[in-house]
Amino acid sequence: VTLAKTITISNSHNYGDMEVKAVNSGGSAYCGGIVGYANKAITITSSSSNGAFTVGKDVTIKDNLYFGAMVSMTGTTFTTTDCSSTNNAQGKGFTTSASVSQFYPGWVGKGATTQVTHTIKNCWNDTDFTATTDFSAGSSCYMTLGISDAVSGAKCSYNIENFTASGDLNFYGNANALFYAGSIFGYWRGSGTMKITNCISTGTHTYDATFKGRTTIAGLVGYKSSKPGITFTTCENASDI
């Protein structure tokens, strides 16, 4: 299945929730979520919402639908620029769900040899900013927001620049899988980077990775031979980091 190549949202404002939404269900085929199996990029520019700002909510897989998701296994970029929200941003454009039936931005499928980059620039949120990655079922698929494939050495990067939150700034990676569960920055031979630059929060900055299941993964930076880089530059807050 090959769907759209590019999705662009520019100069948009919504007084309620703002959602870019796609639902895929049923069948036994490769399905690619919002931008398809062979997509190029998603760009959200100068957009704001007085409610929640969510991209990729309820992108659901059922009955042997594999890979794809919002960025596919072919490599692409996901960029959110000049965006704002007056509600909890839930990762500023990244949906959060504990259900394995959800596809997330950046899912790199098993066997992929891809590079995926997420960039969030010039964004603010007047409550908490939370980027949460949950994986909670037995599966040989992997988590998101910089998860690299466990076999092929895929590389994913996650960049946050010039971000302001008037609440907490949280980054969590949680896995409760019965099989391979990655970490925020890569797994096994995979590698990736995370750069957090000029981020301000009046609450707590939290970077955490918790893993429960058959395979225990150690900490924020991945497992085994992954060599991710984590960079914090000019970040400040009014509480702990």
Describe the predicted segments one by one.
Residues 1-241:
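Surface-exposed loop/turn motifs in large extracellular/passenger domains
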